[in-house]
Structures are given as C-alpha cells and as structure tokens.
Curated annotation (Swiss-Prot):
Keywords annotated in UniProt: Cell inner membrane, Cell membrane, Chaperone, Membrane, Protein transport, Transmembrane, Transmembrane helix, Transport
Location (main, coarse): membrane
Compartments in which it is found: Cell inner membrane
Higher taxonomy: Bacteria, Pseudomonadati, Pseudomonadota, Alphaproteobacteria, Rhodobacterales
GO biological process entries: protein insertion into membrane; protein transport
Protein's UniProt name: Membrane protein insertase YidC
Alphabetical list of InterPro entries matching this protein: Membr_insert_YidC, Membr_insert_YidC_N, YidC/ALB3/OXA1/COX18, YidC/Oxa/ALB_C, YidC_ALB_C, YidC_periplasmic_sf
Cited function: Required for the insertion and/or proper folding and/or complex formation of integral membrane proteins into the membrane. Involved in integration of membrane proteins that insert both dependently and independently of the Sec translocase complex, as well as at least some lipoproteins. Aids folding of multispanning membrane proteins.
TM region(s), chain numbering: 8-28, 378-398, 448-468, 482-502, 506-526, 542-562
Region (Disordered): 33-61
Gene: yidC
C-alpha cells in the first residue's frame, strides 16, 4: 500500500466516520407528541420589596396565579384588527392579549393554496401561544385592583393596528387607578408596548409592570433535532442562554405555586422568549432597564412561560408612571434581526442558532446571503460560495496536489526501495522517510484537501438547516426547497413515470435516491480515477465501493448541501488535474477507467 493511497484512504475514512457520527448524534426529527391543552395561564409574580434599580426574586402574591387560572374564553370577545404589510391578526380586548398573528410572507408548504404560517393563537385553540401584559400588585393593592387575564379593556370602536396607527387600550379599576396600554408596530415584526398607570386614589400604591409569553404544551411542529435549538432563548447582559422544553421540566419547583422556574436578574440589557426552527417571539425591555427574566413550566397545566418583570414602582397619590417594552413576533430573518440589533437590541442576531462553530457559520451565511441577493438564485449562490471557499483554501490545496505529483514522480524509486527491503518493513519505512526528506516531499499532504472540507461541511450544513433564508429556496426545476432532501427519485425515473416518489421518511427513499446524490457518487468516482487503482485487493475494493456508499448516505441530506459537495468535487478534480499536470505528471483518467473495467472483467472470469 503506497503512502498516497494510505493518506487518501485515511482522509476518506475520517469523512465517512464523520457522516456516520452525524447520523448517530443528529438522528432524523421525531414526530412531536400532541399534548392536551388547558385553557389557563399564570401571570408572573410581582416583586413587592425590591428597589426600582435592582429587581429581585421577591415574594409574590398568590392571588395573581389564582385569578389567572380562572380565565374564561368566549367566542364573542371584542378584538382589534392587526394589519401590516407583513403580518395580520388581532388583539383580544379580554386581557389585552396579542394572541392572533399570522405571517403573510410565509406559507406552510410550497403549494400555492397552502395556508400562511400562524405564529400566535388564542387560548382555547390547540397549542395556544400568546403575549400577555399587566401589572403585578404590590403594597396597598390586591389582585382585583390591577388588570388581569380576564380584564375587559376598552378601545376605540373599529380601531386597527397598522404601522401608521397605534391603538390604545384603557381600563379604570373604579378605585382611583387608571391603566392604559398603547400598542404600535413597525413594518416588520416589532411591537412596541407602553403601559401606563395614573394614581388618583389618594394613597400610595406599589406595582410592577410585566410581560409574558405563554405556550400551552409543546409546539405542534417541534422537531426534536439535536442540531437545532427549540425552546427558551435569552440574552442577559451579554450572555446567551438556551433552554430546551424538556429541560424546563427539570427546574426547581417554586413552593408558592408549584410551578418550576428559573430566574435570572438582568442589570442592564437583555431579552427572553421562545424560538423555533424559523419563527420566534421575544420580550424585550428598553435598553439599560434592569429586569427579572423568568423561564417557567407549570406541570399541572402543561404551560411553558417566559416572563419579563420590571422593577416595582411606588406611585404616590396624583402621580403617573409608564413602562416601555417591545415584543418581537415573527420570522427569524437574518437581515431583519440584524437591523434590530443595530438599533440597540444587544446580541439579537444570536437568537439564530449558529451552533458551536459560529465563527464559521456566521461568515459563511453572510457571504451566502450576499451572493443570493446579487444572483437571485440560492442554488447558484451555493455554487458560487463553493468557488469562493475553494479559492480561499487554494494555497493549501496547491501544496497538497503538488506534493502528490512529486510522489508520482518518485514511484519508480519507491518501487526499487521496496524490492531492496523485501520483507524488512522497518528498513523500508526508514529508507522511505529518508527519501521523502531528501526530496522535500510530505506524504501526509494528500489528506489536507479532504480534511479541510470537514469543518466547512459542518458549518454549511448548519447554515442550510437552521436559517430561514434556505427554507423554500429554489434552485431550478424540481429543486424548489434546498433545505430538504432531493425530491426526485429513481422510483419514478425522476418524474418521467406517472407515480409519486417514496415519502422522504420511508425506507424506499433510502434506496430510490434522487438525481443529485447520483451525481455526487459519479463525481466522487471520477475523481478517484485521477490515480490508478491500488494494487492491494482490499484497498481496491474499498475505493470501488466508497463513492456509492457516500451516494446513499448523503441521499437524505439537504439538497443544498449535496449541491455544494458535487460542486466541490468538480472543482477539486479540475484543480488536482491541472496542478499535477503542471508538475510533469498527467493523470490518465480514461485509461484508469478502462483498466478498472478490465480488472473487474478479469476477476469475474477467474471466479467462473
């Protein structure tokens, strides 16, 4: 076994193990269970003792949770319409909840008649998900003195929330406290909520403004995929936190209400909410505002909840106060979230799950996004990105392929060394190393081109899987979604026969793969033909099977990733051929293909 084949076999085996490990650690997404839904929610627990500058966990009034649990949902609750260029929905005047929101720019599937994506839905519907705001009562107040989830707010008849027209909700508790809430929205996905209260009661009162995001049960479309974070996401003074739904059930129990909660005190900048594959909702206090960020799970009601509780305010008679917060509820678009981060929301781009190799995934996606904007086709953008990556690593590739060409030139001398050494392997290895040193050849250089691909492969896979911009991103023809496996299949001759291809999650799809994985296998096979087949029978068999094993293994990967690998193989073949030729060795590709077929025929004849 010569050193060049050893290196190539080692590097390919490492790639093979990486893909096997990928399947082991990142199995296909599991179908999420459908938990029962209860029409209840819990309000956050107010702080009755903390000073305004530094909120603390504090003691809470038990009446808050008790009142919230009595929420009644009726079909004739008045609503205010939400209508912007990008979202539609409504606000319920019962509780003032933002609980009905749909994203106009996104559909559930590629079908033209597919419904648009629903992000928020009211209590009483399966998998209810909504935002709720209010005031937690402190000294001098009871739960009946502040607006709750059951409070019926007043608003101007026919009012519609648009980017140009905010809406205002009001409620008078009849005891001297008047509450108002102004809700506005921008052209994208950011709501601004200003909560105000005026004290005309003649006595001092204490209360704490809060915001809540509540989910009844786990999301219906929970993917349970290891490579993707789904659950709570938050930023606390520059530190990102991610909590899966199943981890929330392991929080320490709160003896006051039996729920399980985790409380973080944020001193200056932060946000918290729920994130999914492509959509997210987050509560965002004003920059510089201290608050408590709470992640909570109510096991009895199966409700997941995130709260933002601002410092308690003591309001003297005749005084007014207000609290400003924001609510992001929409698609995790890189450009949109980047603009919000630039506007002052610290670390908001980290709400996209860039993974452990963020130092690779972030710049790779930024370049891919720019290329897609310039070209207008994501598939072509992936091909262009592959060219740029190959240019970036070309110095290493050149050195590697030049070394491989030198190894070919040394083959006659290496054969003489083997003949002289005979069965003395130690002597042969020693003389080989002296030869490499004398000729300044690195026998391990052949590994570099393949090994360099591994971190790029991981990073690009992450980019294709988690970023919204790849969802339903078209290439050409049948390839209308590069984030999913190749939709074509041998089963129906790539659409030529009048029956459907096997479902992506069926066993048949593993056998009847699409055209892209086949092109991948062929490109790997042709790339092997730059060198003659190994003389060792075991090596030759491994090399013969390897392209086709990779073809079937990568058949279930996102088609965008397979497009990258095919392009990479074609560029690598061209580079290697030209570099080796420039160093005096011209690979006989067609001759190697012919000799391979002749050997196969000879072996079959011998067996007969």
């Amino acid at each position: 076994m010569d050193d060049q084949n050893k290196n190539l076999l080692l590097a390919t085996a490492l790639s093979f193990l990486v893909i096997l490990g990928w399947y082991f650690f990142f199995p296909p997404p599991e179908e999420a269970p459908q938990p029962a839904t209860e029409v209840t929610e819990t309000a956050p627990q107010g702080d009755t003792t903390a000073p305004a500058a530094a909120p603390s966990a504090g003691a809470a009034t038990a009446e808050v949770d008790a009142a919230a649990a009595e929420t009644e949902i009726t079909e004739d609750v008045p609503r205010l319409t939400i209508d912007t260029p990008r979202v539609e929905g409504s606000i319920s005047l019962k509780g003032g909840r933002i609980d009905d929101l749909r994203l106009k720019d996104y559909r559930e599937t590629l079908d033209d008649d597919s419904p648009i994506v629903t992000l928020l839905s009211p209590a009483g519907q399966p998998h209810a998900y909504y935002a709720l705001y209010g005031w937690a009562p402190g000294a001098g107040l009871g739960i009946e003195d502040v607006p709750t989830a059951n409070t019926l707010w007043q608003a101007e008849a026919g009012a519609t929330l648009t980017p140009d027209t905010p809406v205002t909700l009001t409620w008078d508790n009849g005891k001297g406290l008047t509450f108002s809430r102004e809700v506005s929205i921008d052209e994208d996905y950011m709501f601004s909520i200003t909560q105000s209260v005026t004290n005309s009661s003649g006595a001092s009162v204490a209360l704490a403004p809060y915001g809540t995001l509540a989910r009844h049960g786990e999301p219906a479309n929970l993917e349970n995929f290891f490579v993707l974070h789904e659950g709570v996401v938050g930023m606390a003074d520059g530190e990102l936190s991610e909590i899966d739904y199943d981890d929330m059930t392991d929080f320490d129990p709160d003896p006051r209400d039996g729920s399980r909660a985790q409380v973080n005190t944020v001193t200056e900048n932060g946000w918290i909410g729920f994130t999914g594959h492509y959509w997210m909702s987050t509560l965002i206090p004003a920059p510089g505002e201290a608050f408590r960020a709470i992640a909570k799970y109510d096991e009895r009601r199966d409700i997941y909840q995130t709260d933002v509780v601002l410092p308690t305010v003591t309001l003297a008679a005749g005084e007014s106060t207000s609290a400003n917060t924001q609510l992001f509820a929409g698609a995790k678009e890189w450009a949109t979230i980047r603009e919000y981060e630039r506007a002052g929301i610290e670390g908001f781009l980290d709400s996209i799950d860039w993974g452990w190799f963020f130092f690779f995934t972030k710049p790779i996606f930024a370049v891919l996004h720019w290329l897609n904007a310039a070209i207008g086709n994501m598939g072509v953008a992936i091909i262009a990105l592959t060219f740029l990556l190959k240019i970036l690593v070309f110095p290493l590739a050149y050195k590697s392929y030049a070394s491989m060409a030198r190894m070919k030139e040394l083959q006659p001398e290496m054969e003489k060394l083997r003949e002289r050494a005979g069965d003395d392997r130690q002597k042969m290895q020693k003389e080989m190393m002296e030869l490499y040193k004398r000729e300044k050849v690195n026998p391990a250089a052949g590994c570099l081109p393949i090994l360099i691909q591994i971190p790029i492969f991981f990073s690009l896979y992450k980019v294709i899987f988690v970023t919204l911009e790849l969802r339903h991103a078209a290439f050409f023809g049948p390839f209308q979604d590069l984030s999913v496996p190749d939709p074509t299949s041998l089963f129906n001759l790539f659409g030529l026969l009048p029956w459907a291809a096997p479902a992506p999650d069926s066993l048949l799809s593993l056998v009847f793969i699409g055209i892209l994985p086949i092109l991948l296998g062929v490109s790997m096979w042709v790339q092997q033909k730059l060198n003659p087949a190994p003389t060792d029978e075991t090596q030759r068999m491994i090399f013969a099977w390897m392209p086709w094993v990779f073809m079937f293994m990568l058949g279930g990967f996102a088609s965008g990733l397979v497009v990258y690998w095919i392009t990479n193989n074609v560029i690598t073949f061209t580079q290697q051929y030209l570099i080796m030729r420039s160093h005096g060795y011209t690979p006989d590709v067609f001759g190697n293909i012919k000799s391979g077929f002749k050997k196969d025929k000879a072996e079959k004849a011998e067996k007969k």
